[in-house]
Amino acid sequence: MGKQVLDSGWLAARSTELELTGVQLTTTRPPSGTSAPWIEAVVPGTVLGTLLKNKLVPDPFYGLNNEGILDIYDSGREYYTFWFFKSFECKLSENQHVSLNFRAINYSAEVYLNGHKEILPKGMFRRHSIDITDILHPDGKNMLAVLVHPPDHPGQIPPEGGQGGDHEIGKDVATQYVEGWDWMAPIRDRNTGIWDEVSLYTSGPVKIADVHLVSSFFDMFRRAYLHSTVELENKSSWRAECSLTILVTTELDGDFNLIEYHQTHELSIPPESVIQYTLPPLFFYKPNLWWPNGMGKQSLYNVEITIAVKGFGDSDSWNNKFGFRQIESAIDEATGGRLFKVNGQRVFIRGGNWILSDGLLRLSKKRYMTDIKFHADMNFNMIRCWGGGLAERPEFYHYCDIYGLLVWQEFWITGDCDGRGIPVSNPNGPLDHALFLHCARDTIKLLRNHASLALWVGGNEQIPPEDINSALKNDLKLHPFFKHNGVTVIGEDMLSETEDPSQYLDGTRVYIQGSMWEGFANGKGDFTDGPYEIQNPEDFFKDDFYSYGFNPEVGSVGVPVAATIRATMPPEGWQIPLFKRLSDGFIEEVPNPIWEYHKYISYSKPGKVHDQIVLYGQPTNLDDFCEKAQLVNYVQYRALLEGWTSRMWTKYTGVLIWKTQNPWTGLRGQFYDHLHDQTAGFYGCRCAAEPVHVQLNLATYFIEVVNTTHEELSDVAIEVSVWDLDGTCPYYKVIENVLVSPKKVLPITELKYQGSKNAKPVYFVLLKLFRPSNTTILSRNFYWLRLPGTDFKLLEPYRAIEAPLKLTSEVNIVGSAYKIQMRVQNLSKNLNSESVNFLANDEKSDLSKKEGYISRICSGFKNSGTDSLRVVETKGTGSGVAFFLHFSVHAVKKDENEIEDLRILPVHYSDNYFSLVPGETTNISISFEVPHGVTPRVSLRGWNCSEEHYSVL
């Protein structure tokens, strides 16, 4: 009883190279191995992924390789129509039943098993289940062949590219990004393949399917009920007398499970029938609630439902993680933006747009875990699954449940491909509306039990055709328990008189018809999202930057580190852009053809934004360019989020950045690259999106404290220090007795250093929010700033001042997993003297407090005295701020002549791209896994710190 996943041992062959039928393949003429035309197949995966695995095509994401791969429009659909073959063993006992399940195929298929044929209907986002009980061979040895056809309308890629190519893919119920976008090259096979899980499922005479779990709350979330409806299919020819048991447990520390509920109900199911059975609601008093990232724990219960049949025993079981939580959404009266509440608490949305993890649909659990943890590490609380991408997989949602990411899931409509593109096409959406609705309803059943799923949206920058939109509104209408704005409209005493909410398809989440409607952008569907290019950092704080309460898309630059450029492009792609100075003084960047193909966008906007990279000096080579790009990435995205947060609840209810990552080796709009290395923008977001945060408003130069939590922030103080390039501190102030109400932004005081007569053209500002009672730092924020009309070119000679650093590490190794606690100290001496000129006399009195505060705040790391401690001091002899330090992890070279990319990825850092003032210490946690036989080393580099290699063994 249970599931057997078929994810290995598959073979594939192009249909035009094989003259055998499916009946022959699964009876008398099966393939004997990887002799032509058969090759090893990638399942789950795509045809292009299979061809790449067998080196029959070059890596489409490397350089310009994609241009050398035949496009489906030019080759014809038959070229990417493939057979997939697998033999498997499955032997049944009496009264057992088995189904063959495909969780998704793109786009249609013919299935042959032991000579029997089954035609699978079209649609990329639907499950297929075939009862194969009577088809299996008695000896348990079986042969399976699947002929997979591409989408019916794969479309043509115009020479100039475009948003969704010629839009033909919009006629099918399929992912649309595959025709290419302004951030994506086209996918040549249009993601044809068995792209999701294939499995065998064995049960007894009665099978469980499509369980629906819902929680309802009363009495300010102290009283809760778990509602559940189960679909039960009796596959036997006799009436089944059954016992249905539900078991609810919660995990305690030490891998112990606490049983919360264990109930059994008796029922009878007619022969060869399917019934819906609703269990009585289970009552919970003060259950552990599931909260979004940054608001509390992601408490999850385990729900197991088992069906036993009289005379047979256990027939089937189902289990799933479940989070008690309630999501509300309405248009906020104060801002006009869409407002979300979880468990009665307002959530200020800071998150990002998501396309999909990989353009060849290599969607492993490990990759999903890294992707979602990265979003949580950035302190984000929402991911928007864009309508031109996927209905994301259960594994994606599992990790969103674990890490607390709310998910906005769109259906497969985009303005570009469905009525608003240039040229206009498919104004009535996909050709088969019934198919679209079938896929939508099946997707809802697949995903609805996930606590992280927050809302359904009809499409991207477009609404579905009227009949589809009306059907979705009806299918997703809210149950009366959830039609409220903070107050439950039905009392607990009405539970027995109201239709159980688990009987709805999904009545717990709002349905919004499109991404720019009903509280998003201007709410009317006009193109009022964006912008998507480089900005002056201070502009994000200005009142006229964005006019509406919730921006679903605002984006900018995203060049990765130089090592990624070298790993994903040939040497001719390592040439940095040409910087062409225009007559008005602005700079136009001209990228090389490979960068242009990989959708690079400029770090300048002639006429509005001066080149943000050249502000640091003309880059000389790829390493210099990418290092300066990281400076800009950090500043750009920190300013974006801090600008939005500065007007939390007064003007804005949320923002989603376009976009957090790329499904290929693109060069725009990303916080980590396709290889899973973070940009500095990642850590700019992590800083800005802290639940409790201190920040500098770059438009007003007021220091602000942000409290997004539902608790008052009291007994806190702010330390403000300004540092010159020579390591002196001309400005220091401590502001005590700060109190910030829940969910408020409080301006504290204006930073006036930049207006003083002795202000330096380039200077550093360090803000610390801390508790004086125990010197716990709640938020730390480091800025590098310039006076108006100047640039950052004074930082260029600063590189020659080698900052002296001390690194202390403690290493923990379990199998292939490494966890390193790294303490980094700037050994520079504090050069302050009593002759330092302050702006006002009242600030001079704070000087005597400075050393005490700094030494206490920076003393958090204690030497444990264990053998795993290592200490290294760099050779720097200069003095001043250790600027823009960043760790990386590499494999130790086995040969000094090795030049390939030796980075170990992914790596999770508690912080990176950080700076330390003289005498300051910080602690960084680093975790990663190493491949077998690889010895890792940690590298620390910085603007004024040359690379140091640090072996962890």
From Swiss-Prot:
Q: Which UniProt keywords apply?
A: Glycosidase, Hydrolase
Q: Name one GO molecular function term.
A: mannosylglycoprotein endo-beta-mannosidase activity
Origin: domain of life: Eukaryota
Q: Please tell me in which tissues this protein is expressed.
A: Ubiquitously expressed.
* Keyword flag Hydrolase: yes
Locate the active site. Answer: 461 (proton donor), 553 (nucleophile)
Q: Which InterPro entries match?
A: Beta-gal/glucu_dom_sf (IPR036156), Beta-mannosidase-like_N2 (IPR054593), EBDG/EBM (IPR043534), Galactose-bd-like_sf (IPR008979), Glyco_hydro_2_AS (IPR023232), Glyco_hydro_2_cat (IPR006103), Glyco_hydro_2_Ig-like (IPR006102), Glycoside_hydrolase_SF (IPR017853)
**BP-aspect Gene Ontology terms:** carbohydrate metabolic process
Segments crossing the lipid bilayer: none
Quaternary data? Heterotrimer of 31 kDa, 28 kDa and 42 kDa subunits.
Family designation: Belongs to the glycosyl hydrolase 2 family.
Query: What name does this protein carry?
Result: Mannosylglycoprotein endo-beta-mannosidase
Q: Which organism is it from?
A: Lilium longiflorum
Q: Lineage in the entry?
A: Eukaryota, Viridiplantae, Streptophyta, Embryophyta, Tracheophyta
